[in-house]
Amino acid sequence: MVHAECVWWLGIRILFVPPVSLEMHSVNVNNMSIQQQQQHQPQQQLLKPIRLANVSTQAQSLDTLHYKCQQEGPCMEQACLASVIYAGVNLKPRVRPKEELLAHAKDFLDQYFASIRRLQSPAHEARWAQVEKEVAATGTYELTETELVYGAKLAWRNAPRCIGRIQWAKLQVFDCRQVTTTSGMFEALCNHIKYSTNKGNIRSAITIFPHRTDGKHDFRIWNKQLISYAGHKSKDGTVIGDPACVEFTEICIKLGWKGKGTMFDVLPLVLSANGEDPDYFDLPPELVFEVPLSHPKYKWFSELGLKWFALPAVSGMMFDCGGLQFTAAPFNGWYMNSEIGSRNLGDTNRYNMLEKIAQKMELDTRTPVTLWKDLAMVEANVAVLHSFQLHNVTIVDHHSAAESFMKHLENEQRLRGGCPADWVWIVPPISGSATPVFFQEMANYFLYPGYIYQEDAWKCHEWKEIDVKHGLKKEKRKFHFKQIARAVKFTSKLFGSALSKRIKATILFATETGKSEMYARKLGDIFSHAFHSQVLSMEDYDMSKIEHEALLLVVASTFGNGDPPENGQGFAQSLYTIKMDENGLPNGHTNNTLASSASFIKANSQTDRQASLERCDSFRGSTGDADVFGPLSNVRFAVFALGSSAYPNFCAFGSYVDNLLGELGGERLVKLTTGDEMCGQAQACNKWAPEVFSVACDTFCLDSDETFLEATQMLHSEAVTASTVRFVESATQDLCKALSHLHNKKVWKCPLLGKRNLHGKGSTRATLLLEIERNENISYQPGDHVGVLACNRKELVEGIISHLESAIDPDKSVQLQILKENTTPDGIVRNWIPHDRLPTCSLRTMLTRFLDITTPPSPNLLQFFASCATNSEDQEKLTELATDSAAYEDWRYWKYPNLLEVLEEFPSVRVLPALLIAQLTPLQPRFYSISSAPSLYANQIHLTVAVVQYCTQDGKGPIHYGVASNYLYDVTIGDSIYLFTRSAPNFHLPKSDTAPIIMVGPGTGIAPFRGFWQHRLAQRSLNGPGKFGKMSLFFGCRLRNLDLYQEEKESMLKEGILSKVFLALSREPSIPKTYVQDLLRVECKSVYIQIVQEGGHFYVCGDCTMAEHVFRTLRQIIQDQGNMTDHQVDNFMLAMRDENRYHEDIFGITLRTAEVHNRSRESARIRMASQSQP
């Protein structure tokens, strides 16, 4: 028989039929697909929505969430049992059979994958198959860490008796499922208490120990709360202390504990692991934060000698998740004042202080009509609130708690269609009808996962050693915290670090050149000393896990003029989607192109809502305001942003990530830190890394003194030494595969078909048109890029080889190997492993194709060179450059030396080949806009490349060659070029052929536009004249004879492909200096009509400075021609981005001009100085 469930409100009983319990209707779900199992579910045709009213406001809602109820309600048809504490709950230990376990697991996994929008996905199916396999083999299974965190939060969200659930997502989960002993449990619980107490700024947390297997190896915490006061019962029946703890106090005494016999003796922790008999552990006094109670008005209140502990941590309940029963899973929130003032101190079966307080107040306690109990209770609550706030301890008053719960009900009704709530427990024990929850009808039902009552451990424990006289285990040796810590420290290094390793630190990077990855991996090494750290590229990160991260560190560079790197675009879009979901917008509303566009990121990098939390923000007052909590409210984060101040939108992507993480509720550990490529980037990271490590250790209450010293040494220590790196002979790898592995791209080998200088054979300048054979598997669209994998110059490679110490054959194929140490239960194990990125090839090939030898060495590499120098002057100079940021930047700017020039400047530096190779960074691809259209040149890819050569030291230094442009200049027809393509979706042609197009591209910025007009030509040839929108080109160069593709442009004008071509000449004699933005101003009316009135598209390609000037010019044109205010024109420009009508393809400084570099370096120095100030 299925009993009716009850909705209870002021004695009114509303019945409904619950769904069939999973326990009652277990089916064999083995070997079923998810779809088959859904068809197998019992029909729930009798279910109807529950109408719930608010008697005060007359508002009504329909609860449908109860359809998912999986447990019979406590009420009978003849009686309502809503006020019975354990009604309908089986407290006895029970092991679920496989079929029932699988049914629960199936339900939970459905909920989990639905929450991450992957219900019935291949990942869901694979996970379910894995669980089925585990259960079939072992009778149980393991939740993943992310599933566990999700389940713990959802269980709090489902708890019908909790009034503070609005903060359900802000729960720190300590995964302690690997603990096997009571001492390990005690260490974890001490960490939990320390973390959650947080010097009074209470934080919600749960610690989860191994789940039940066969019922004979349970882990249990015998205390009902982690911190509680003893109840000492005298022979006359009176109790000193807390009467609620008398029975458990006697258990502790029989185990050997001895209290002091005061009203507030803190009970020890009694713990049993793996079904063994319990041990007890005294909590160290410094771990238990107690608040002495005083009153703001009555001075005598403090004379009562009352106090209470700050942390309410429930430890006797069972966490039931996915069919797994976690019998030891203590959790905490923070106190509501009435829990202490009304219940703990006021209840007659607790401290029963109301009469004493009333007598002190000189109230007449002989008759209830004086309301002395009510008055005394109010003042007790006043004292509790006053005392907690006086000592800066988090607490919430019952009015604020009730208001927050009403907000939570509203949220849940919108998000889930209902909210389980037990009216008897939700309504505060004081001022009930003065709170809004009193008037709200509620539906009480139970959802999984959840927190469930279970039988007291001492009532069901099977003792291994029996003391016949007392019926308990013989007296145990008492364990002190210091003894445990000492034993852990000296007996097992692995176990000693296990506690900190339970806290995961996820480090994400987004990079184009590899610098962000390098800094991120160094950060990972530092955090591995105290956390379980993992380093991932943003594109490899599973965004479904972000809500459940405890610690998130981001190292992000900015690409171009504010864009994310290619491997960060998906992350940017996902963050934006979360933000839109939080704002209640439908999923289809989000614009992924907008989310990763430069203008959008620039705008969002300059805003910061007050709702985002700093670490120093306090919740010590009333915490009922839910507005500051977002979907990432449980995430602590810090961001290090890399960029170049040569670009106007400096570090825009890192700022964007920092702001969005904050706006989504994340807690910022330290303020955004930037590293400027123009000055002191490595130094900025070296300053930021130890700071964020120290703050993180403090946040998670990890002892960081000794660990901090070990970790920060990683910043200054050599990653490899002569004894930890070596070359071994090995067969050569395929070059194409090796390059693909290094760059994590599909690399193609493509022959060069043709090459010519667009300025003519006699010109002193060279801008090349390269025609490359296109592999049939390469696909691209006009506007996309090619990444060219160039070779370093032969003379550089030869020179470096001549400076190496060893006489290794540079043409023999070798493999670089690193000696790695791994700590195992058997001790430290050392193994030689291949370098994770470099291939097996010759030393010459490594220096030619795989390693960067032209970028000035970093301070870390110079410090390494100092250790290799035999001349004291070389050592001193190199050490100065490595440690003095200003000296390094001046040296770097003036000489911009390549590796060979450094070795020549410091000739006493002699380096082992393997050691040098291990220190160098990868040679990065050089990107070029494709200058052709596949619709016109089906088997070719064209590139437009300006050959870069310059002299350092104001033109008086040695000549330097651009790596890729000079490689392409030297390559001969028929030789193979290794390359890959990169999509540029924000720079593709409009979907509508009729939309006007304005193209602005001085110099080689014309490259992608050649592909545009070729595509339009092919379209017209294939489809006929048709109706095409105008296509106008604004091109600029220094002199008329440097006009690129002049004849081709004239031909396109005659063909009607190009509507107009405008030429700006900046150095032509006898005419005024003119730039492309000047011509835009001349054509302002036409530009306005095409862009604003006709909905045209605007494309800009070139260096970042030009692009910023063009953007400002277009903005001014639209404002002037449209008579717009600043606010209106800014909104219009952002709307163009939103509609993907403003397109930028931006690259950095083309030549190292003194004007640009001096300005950028000066701004970088000012920024560094400001960041170093406290």
Swiss-Prot record:
Stimulated by calcium/calmodulin. L-arginine binds at Q225, W334, Y335, E339, N344. Residues 745-990 form the FAD-binding FR-type domain. (6R)-L-erythro-5,6,7,8-tetrahydrobiopterin binds at S83, W425, F438. Gene3D superfamilies: 3.40.50.360, NADPH-cytochrome p450 Reductase, Chain A, domain 3, Nitric Oxide Synthase, Chain A, domain 1, Nitric Oxide Synthase, Chain A, domain 3, Nitric Oxide Synthase,Heme Domain,Chain A domain 2, Nucleotide-binding domain of ferredoxin-NADP reductase (FNR) module, Translation factors. FAD binds at residues 780-791, 923-933. Its cofactor is heme b; FAD; FMN. Keywords: Calmodulin-binding, FAD, Flavoprotein, FMN, Heme, Iron, Metal-binding, NADP, Oxidoreductase. Binds 1 FAD. Binds 1 FMN. One of its GO terms (molecular function) is flavin adenine dinucleotide binding. Its EC number is 1.14.13.39. PANTHER family: NITRIC OXIDE SYNTHASE (PTHR43410:SF1), NITRIC OXIDE SYNTHASE OXYGENASE (PTHR43410). This is Nitric oxide synthase, salivary gland. It comes from Rhodnius prolixus. The lineage of its organism: Eukaryota, Metazoa, Ecdysozoa, Arthropoda, Hexapoda.
